[in-house]
Amino acid sequence: MTQLQISLLLTATISLLHLVVATPYEAYPIGKQYPPVARVNESFTFQISNDTYKSSVDKTAQITYNCFDLPSWLSFDSSSRTFSGEPSSDLLSDANTTLYFNVILEGTDSADSTSLNNTYQFVVTNRPSISLSSDFNLLALLKNYGYTNGKNALKLDPNEVFNVTFDRSMFTNEESIVSYYGRSQLYNAPLPNWLFFDSGELKFTGTAPVINSAIAPETSYSFVIIATDIEGFSAVEVEFELVIGAHQLTTSIQNSLIINVTDTGNVSYDLPLNYVYLDDDPISSDKLGSINLLDAPDWVALDNATISGSVPDELLGKNSNPANFSVSIYDTYGDVIYFNFEVVSTTDLFAISSLPNINATRGEWFSYYFLPSQFTDYVNTNVSLEFTNSSQDHDWVKFQSSNLTLAGEVPKNFDKLSLGLKANQGSQSQELYFNIIGMDSKITHSNHSANATSTRSSHHSTSTSSYTSSTYTAKISSTSAAATSSAPAALPAANKTSSHNKKAVAIACGVAIPLGVILVALICFLIFWRRRRENPDDENLPHAISGPDLNNPANKPNQENATPLNNPFDDDASSYDDTSIARRLAALNTLKLDNHSATESDISSVDEKRDSLSGMNTYNDQFQSQSKEELLAKPPVQPPESPFFDPQNRSSSVYMDSEPAVNKSWRYTGNLSPVSDIVRDSYGSQKTVDTEKLFDLEAPEKEKRTSRDVTMSSLDPWNSNISPSPVRKSVTPSPYNVTKHRNRHLQNIQDSQSGKNGITPTTMSTSSSDDFVPVKDGENFCWVHSMEPDRRPSKKRLVDFSNKSNVNVGQVKDIHGRIPEML
């Protein structure tokens, strides 16, 4: 292969890798955006998300979209990312036919000009479309679950648990619906993590997010409920909002307000601000912010909370609808509510076309309030209640026309009651029908205008009105829907009920909180009492010797400055207990086990006092010699052959020149200071003895003689004249002989240790280990003299170290040497 071919191959490979790495990726497929169903002879519009494709090079780069293989009736606008068109009836000849077709969506990354193509599926059908029912009123539904903003939103407190349940009857062609979806409004994105949708019950449930500021304006979240007759697509959507804020600006008005003009066309209407609430109380003038007209015609004006204007003559006429508009009302925190208005010229007495059914809880007090805004001219209208079915028991319910209140005690066996609300004005009469439906006890949602919830079902009306009003409650237009609300005269009753509820809550809190505190205190006391029973007082516990301090350098005299290694003989700290060997050996620290003269007190601490007065950290081996040869004259000490070992400073774990190391307490130093005239032996000795020597006490197999005498060290600082003892013959180690020899030796020591000042020293130098041998007599050990050394193989080794450090038990694997003899 030539160099040119290799170069071209590498270039192609690099280009391919570049395409693989830098190609835009599919972030939000069109299939998950639930595109609408295209229906013949109906307009089709669908805007895809700008996050359908994302750049893999620059996350902020915008993707440019283009579409291919579109049918003739469908077009795509790249600038707005919108599909639009209208399929003709010729496309599908048979009834109830569905046709799927594919389109190719191309996305180009503006960062590096790379592209991504994907194929997506759309559908067109000639099935009858699904739409909203004419009597559906979104505000009337949301009012059952809390306060509203007067337009299309439910107001929530931060961290409030809520649910909103929709009714299947709000859709037409209900039998053709196969699926329901709950999504976010923008591009039908998934719901946030604090909101859930149950497609079986059409219920949104969740907990409102937290607001971190008490003065921050409210935040709106838009959602949709989608109904479809083709899986994976959308047929009709109902949009609503959840508004969360630190303060709640709400209204109890749940329908469009009707302004009925006279033949002159003059308009004058005061805004019903007494139906506006801030944090559950009627809003005061100092808390009011701006008031604005929205989508109003030029001839409508707003002045000091009053709507005024004059309808043009060409718009006047019987049952005409000259204008629809809204008014936004803000508070000082930036929260907003809306009033929706319809200007009409009509002879109708009702401003609404139907009334919803009302739920009543069996065995409880029932009350419901109608709104003056439900009438076109409430001041000049007489309102009454009629019972349409005389066979039903209706004696329990009463109607007060003065405040439009319906109230009574619901019977326990109540099922249903059919009623009609009748409006009369002169010779004109109009009536709307509704039902009161009995329900079992359940938790209801309180509001400003009613203590009972309401549901929607089929409605009937005898109204002769023929006008159609547009509402602001849904994304898809529908006819004006029914609503209920309270009258101004009913406000005192509602406030009274609210005050009663607050008192009941206060009483409940006053009882429940102290009981809760007492219960918590009792639980804490029981827990404390139980722990006290499981853990008795310290004075009842047995006194135990504390465990050894593993970090105390005195416990490791040979490991100072040593290289740390993993010690195979180390014990796990968790394994220490009161019966462990380490604790038992630690108890031996209180015994005087040093190999000193028997004349010393067993609890004497004079040695330690003298050691502490010396102020030196080293000792002289001449005071601790255990071999008679050490007491004889020696030639001057030559420098050690090994740069590491010093015969004058031997460790208890090492032999030098086949000589045993001295046995010294790790608390002992040999540089003793002069004995004071006043010496107290009242302190317990803390000296210890080597554990291996302590337990290695076996009687020799046979008695041997030696010509060496038992001699006290001539280097003792308290004895300048010590005479050698006569040679003694070995005897059978009977108790009598052992005692006799021991007493004779002690007498010789006492005779030879009289100082110039007549002071008998308390501490004597250690006798030779060649002469005294422990012999077991029954359960006790006695010391006898051995005339000849009994040499046996020792387990200790003569070692060499390259690091010139002291001996560390953890370094046993690195030690090399020979095994010497041991006395």
Curated annotation (Swiss-Prot):
<keyword id="KW-1003">Cell membrane</keyword>
<keyword id="KW-0597">Phosphoprotein</keyword>
<feature type="region of interest" description="Disordered">
    <location>
        <begin position="596"/>
        <end position="627"/>
    </location>
</feature>
<dbReference type="GO" id="GO:0000324">
    <property type="term" value="C:fungal-type vacuole"/>
</dbReference>
<dbReference type="GO" id="GO:0005886">
    <property type="term" value="C:plasma membrane"/>
</dbReference>
<keyword id="KW-0472">Membrane</keyword>
<keyword id="KW-0812">Transmembrane</keyword>
<feature type="glycosylation site" description="N-linked (GlcNAc...) asparagine">
    <location>
        <position position="389"/>
    </location>
</feature>
<keyword id="KW-1133">Transmembrane helix</keyword>
<feature type="glycosylation site" description="N-linked (GlcNAc...) asparagine">
    <location>
        <position position="117"/>
    </location>
</feature>
<feature type="region of interest" description="Disordered">
    <location>
        <begin position="700"/>
        <end position="734"/>
    </location>
</feature>
<feature type="glycosylation site" description="N-linked (GlcNAc...) asparagine">
    <location>
        <position position="324"/>
    </location>
</feature>
<dbReference type="GO" id="GO:0005509">
    <property type="term" value="F:calcium ion binding"/>
</dbReference>
<feature type="glycosylation site" description="N-linked (GlcNAc...) asparagine">
    <location>
        <position position="447"/>
    </location>
</feature>
<dbReference type="GO" id="GO:0000131">
    <property type="term" value="C:incipient cellular bud site"/>
</dbReference>
<feature type="signal peptide">
    <location>
        <begin position="1"/>
        <end position="22"/>
    </location>
</feature>
<feature type="transmembrane region" description="Helical">
    <location>
        <begin position="509"/>
        <end position="529"/>
    </location>
</feature>
<dbReference type="Pfam" id="PF05345">
    <property type="entry name" value="He_PIG"/>
</dbReference>
<feature type="compositionally biased region" description="Low complexity">
    <location>
        <begin position="449"/>
        <end position="467"/>
    </location>
</feature>
<feature type="compositionally biased region" description="Polar residues">
    <location>
        <begin position="709"/>
        <end position="724"/>
    </location>
</feature>
<feature type="glycosylation site" description="N-linked (GlcNAc...) asparagine">
    <location>
        <position position="41"/>
    </location>
</feature>
<feature type="glycosylation site" description="N-linked (GlcNAc...) asparagine">
    <location>
        <position position="451"/>
    </location>
</feature>
<feature type="glycosylation site" description="N-linked (GlcNAc...) asparagine">
    <location>
        <position position="382"/>
    </location>
</feature>
<feature type="compositionally biased region" description="Low complexity">
    <location>
        <begin position="760"/>
        <end position="769"/>
    </location>
</feature>
<keyword id="KW-0325">Glycoprotein</keyword>
<dbReference type="InterPro" id="IPR015919">
    <property type="entry name" value="Cadherin-like_sf"/>
</dbReference>
<feature type="topological domain" description="Extracellular">
    <location>
        <begin position="23"/>
        <end position="508"/>
    </location>
</feature>
<feature type="glycosylation site" description="N-linked (GlcNAc...) asparagine">
    <location>
        <position position="266"/>
    </location>
</feature>
<feature type="topological domain" description="Cytoplasmic">
    <location>
        <begin position="530"/>
        <end position="823"/>
    </location>
</feature>
<feature type="glycosylation site" description="N-linked (GlcNAc...) asparagine">
    <location>
        <position position="403"/>
    </location>
</feature>
<dbReference type="GO" id="GO:0007120">
    <property type="term" value="P:axial cellular bud site selection"/>
</dbReference>
<feature type="modified residue" description="Phosphoserine">
    <location>
        <position position="676"/>
    </location>
</feature>
<feature type="region of interest" description="Disordered">
    <location>
        <begin position="539"/>
        <end position="576"/>
    </location>
</feature>
<dbReference type="GO" id="GO:0032153">
    <property type="term" value="C:cell division site"/>
</dbReference>
<feature type="glycosylation site" description="N-linked (GlcNAc...) asparagine">
    <location>
        <position position="304"/>
    </location>
</feature>
<feature type="glycosylation site" description="N-linked (GlcNAc...) asparagine">
    <location>
        <position position="260"/>
    </location>
</feature>
<keyword id="KW-0732">Signal</keyword>
<feature type="glycosylation site" description="N-linked (GlcNAc...) asparagine">
    <location>
        <position position="50"/>
    </location>
</feature>
<feature type="region of interest" description="Disordered">
    <location>
        <begin position="447"/>
        <end position="467"/>
    </location>
</feature>
<comment type="function">
    <text>Required for haploid cells axial budding pattern. Acts as an anchor to help direct new growth components and/or polarity establishment components like the BUD5 GTP/GDP exchange factor to localize at the cortical axial budding site. Regulates septin organization in late G1 independently of its role in polarity-axis determination.</text>
</comment>
<feature type="compositionally biased region" description="Polar residues">
    <location>
        <begin position="552"/>
        <end position="566"/>
    </location>
</feature>
<protein>
    <recommendedName>
        <fullName>Axial budding pattern protein 2</fullName>
    </recommendedName>
</protein>
